[in-house]
């Protein structure tokens, strides 16, 4: 990342994985109570921010299928501007790397990186807690990325407690299909009564490391997604025959964990033609963590 008084370049918006994802209830407003552990990855979209003197917020690059006015990045910048009353403006460039509809948190991470970067570029000095209170207005996953640490998540995903996770390498395989999150959450077959667990339960099992990630919990959405999307089912079956694996979020991406990059790359090299695989190392902290206190 490069930093100047007029711009912030090469700001990473890291992907996340759900190491497990349990749906424990449904609220009257339609939101779901969940439990999960969010893992940051050193892989994601890259954003660039340049000050404007006319006060406008503008997206300087096109994102196919995402109109500028509905882009979470633009919404995040405008929300921050309205909250603080700053007269500053910004041009935002987005180098998309993460596939959309993949369960990797791409749009949410872009929004969080925008909040953190503009907190620095616009010299706002908002606290992390204040940024998180804005982030929840943009989506359930956005507060996690502002939180900036690997976390045990509860509520709708906004109740976060830091967890220390071992350094690992991940292979993330994404079939060529977009899975709408709302469609999966509304499916009548989705399990919504999984028994709550504790952070101690997860840490005890994780530390044993036997067969991780599938040694603890499950992804309650995986069965619904694989029943509706054959492409995801094919990836799950193929990868699980090689190593323990699991779908992240509402899909479509499926991941496996390895102790070394070499092991992950070896499996990636054997992926069927046409499948998109990425190898990434775990992160313990968001690259822009220091941009809020």
Swiss-Prot record:
Q: Which GO terms describe its biological process?
A: isopentenyl diphosphate biosynthetic process, methylerythritol 4-phosphate pathway; terpenoid biosynthetic process
Give GO terms: molecular function aspect only.
4-(cytidine 5'-diphospho)-2-C-methyl-D-erythritol kinase activity; ATP binding
Q: Which UniProt keywords apply?
A: ATP-binding, Isoprene biosynthesis, Kinase, Nucleotide-binding, Transferase
Question: Reaction catalysed?
Answer: 4-CDP-2-C-methyl-D-erythritol + ATP = 4-CDP-2-C-methyl-D-erythritol 2-phosphate + ADP + H(+)
Listed binding positions for ATP are 99-109
Its UniProt pathway annotation is:
Isoprenoid biosynthesis; isopentenyl diphosphate biosynthesis via DXP pathway; isopentenyl diphosphate from 1-deoxy-D-xylulose 5-phosphate: step 3/6
Pfam families to which the protein is assigned, alphabetical = GHMP_kinases_C (PF08544), GHMP_kinases_N (PF00288)
- The positions making up the signal sequence are none
Keyword Transferase: yes or no? yes
This entry's Enzyme Commission designation comes to 2.7.1.148
User: What InterPro entries does the database record attribute to this sequence?
Assistant: GHMP_kinase_C_dom, GHMP_kinase_C_sf, GHMP_kinase_N_dom, IspE, Ribosomal_Su5_D2-typ_SF, Ribsml_uS5_D2-typ_fold_subgr
Q: Where is the active site?
A: 16, 141
Family stated for the protein in its record = Belongs to the GHMP kinase family. IspE subfamily.
- Name the job this protein performs: Catalyzes the phosphorylation of the position 2 hydroxy group of 4-diphosphocytidyl-2C-methyl-D-erythritol.
Its protein name is 4-diphosphocytidyl-2-C-methyl-D-erythritol kinase
């Amino acid at each position: 990342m490069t930093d100047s008084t007029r711009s912030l370049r090469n700001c990473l918006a890291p992907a996340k994985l759900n190491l497990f994802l349990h749906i424990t209830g449904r609220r009257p407003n339609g939101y779901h109570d969940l439990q999960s552990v969010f893992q940051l990855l050193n892989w994601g979209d890259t954003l660039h921010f340049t000050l404007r003197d006319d006060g406008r917020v503008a997206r300087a690059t096109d994102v196919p299928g995402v109109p500028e006015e509905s882009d979470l990045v633009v919404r995040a910048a405008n929300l921050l501007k309205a909250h603080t009353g700053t007269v500053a403006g910004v041009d935002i460039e987005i180098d998309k790397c993460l596939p959309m509809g993949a369960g990797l948190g791409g749009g949410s991470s872009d929004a969080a990186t925008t909040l953190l970067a503009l907190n620095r570029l616009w010299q706002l000095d908002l606290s992390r807690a204040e940024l998180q209170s804005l982030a929840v207005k943009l989506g359930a996953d956005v507060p996690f990325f502002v939180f900036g640490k690997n976390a045990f998540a509860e509520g709708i995903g906004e109740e976060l407690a830091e967890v220390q996770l071992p350094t690992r390498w991940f292979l993330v395989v994404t079939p060529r299909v977009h899975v709408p999150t709302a469609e999966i959450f509304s499916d009548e077959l989705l399990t919504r009564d999984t028994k709550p667990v504790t952070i101690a339960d997860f840490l005890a099992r994780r530390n044993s490391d036997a067969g991780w990630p599938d040694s603890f919990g499950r992804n309650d959405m995986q069965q619904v997604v694989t029943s509706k999307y054959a492409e995801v089912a094919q990836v799950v079956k193929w990868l699980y025959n090689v190593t323990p694996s699991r779908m992240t979020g509402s899909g479509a991406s499926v991941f496996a964990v390895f102790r070394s990059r070499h092991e992950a790359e070896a499996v990636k090299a054997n992926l069927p033609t046409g499948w998109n695989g990425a190898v990434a190392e775990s992160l313990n902290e968001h690259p822009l963590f220091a941009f809020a206190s």
